[in-house]
Design a protein with these regions (language model features):
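A cross-family phosphate/adenosyl-ligand binding-site feature
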Residues: 2-11, 19-86, 90-91
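Short beta-strand segments
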Residues: 11, 37-39, 97-100, 131-132, ...
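Short glycine-rich anion-binding loops that position phosphate/pyrophosphate groups of nucleotides
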Residues: 14, 42, 75-76, 100-103, ...
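Short, Asp-centered acidic motifs that coordinate Mg2+ and/or phosphate
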Residues: 94
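Glycine/threonine-rich flexible loop motifs
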Residues: 103-112
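Hydrophobic/aromatic ligand-binding patch that stacks against planar heteroaromatic rings
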Residues: 117-121
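Glycine-rich phosphate/pyrophosphate-binding loops
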Residues: 122-144
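Electrostatically charged, flexible surface regions
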Residues: 143-257
């Protein structure tokens, strides 16, 4: 009996026309049956947002051999939910978000719509991977990341991932990658996040900006260190965010009324 091709579901938060998504498609062609359900425009920073206040629609963009592309009016997470409910003929073997224009290392994982895609796939019990490049520009060069994306995806298809675990993969913006480092999430936070301006007609407005404050710049096991030294940063990420080490401490607090 002929072996079934892997089923691969893709989405992103930069929109269906983003170069990163289309480079991801190019890099994965031939690996299986690819279905894309991506937002119809940029949804960066959408995290795990879902749409509940109005209907969501989707439209077919193009269809080729082993590739069908749809665009969706909702969020990145809406895209995954809707694709699984409508256009995916069988359970995907892998859900992939990316390639994101901009890294999703450290605390960015909490804001990222690309990682929202990945976490939604993970919540559904599907092996899921997020790919991001440390370059926000629309014409970013993704070419050096594609061989690694293909290899990592092959390995996930071969081995699978444990329930509740996904991969957050970030690439430095360099043509000369030094290899792969298995990393943990860097401890840090965004500071000076708003730029204030005065409107010519009166009043003020703000643009979100900011600087990343790395609490541990010398931590060689962290994703920021790996990226800063030319390595691909692979961070296994879990959806259970329970702080188990704090549970016994809290039992000693006087929380009853």
């Amino acid at each position: 009996m002929k072996k079934e091709k892997p089923s691969i579901l893709l989405s992103n938060d930069d929109g269906v026309e983003a170069k990163g998504l289309n480079e991801l498609i190019r890099g994965l062609r031939g690996m299986g049956e690819i279905i894309v359900m991506a937002p119809d425009g940029p949804r960066s920073g959408a995290s795990g947002a879902i749409t509940s206040e109005h209907p969501v629609k989707y439209y077919k963009v193009r269809e080729e051999e082993d590739l069908t592309v749809y665009k969706c009016t909702g969020t990145p997470v809406d895209c995954v939910k809707l694709a699984l409910h409508t256009v995916v003929p069988r359970r995907p073997d892998v859900v992939i978000g990316g390639i994101n224009h901009g890294d999703n290392s450290s605390v960015n994982v909490h804001y990222s719509g690309t990682m929202g895609v990945v976490i939604e796939g993970c919540l559904k019990g599907i092996s899921s991977i997020g790919y991001s490049l440390c370059n926000h520009f629309a014409d970013a060069d993704f070419s050096s990341s594609l061989p690694y994306i293909r290899r990592i995806t092959e390995q996930v298809l071969e081995h699978g991932l444990p329930l509740g675990i996904c991969l957050n993969v970030n690439f430095p913006d360099t043509a000369s990658l030094k290899g792969v480092r298995i990393c943990r999430q860097t401890n840090g936070a965004w500071i000076n996040e708003w730029k204030r301006s005065l409107h010519p007609r009166g009043g003020e407005y703000f643009w979100l900006t900011g600087e990343f404050d790395n609490y541990e710049p010398e931590a060689e096991d962290s994703d920021h260190w790996a990226l800063g030294h030319g390595y691909v940063a692979v961070t296994p990420t879990q959806i259970d965010v329970t702080a188990y080490g704090m549970m016994n401490e809290l039992k000693n607090w006087n929380l009853e009324v």
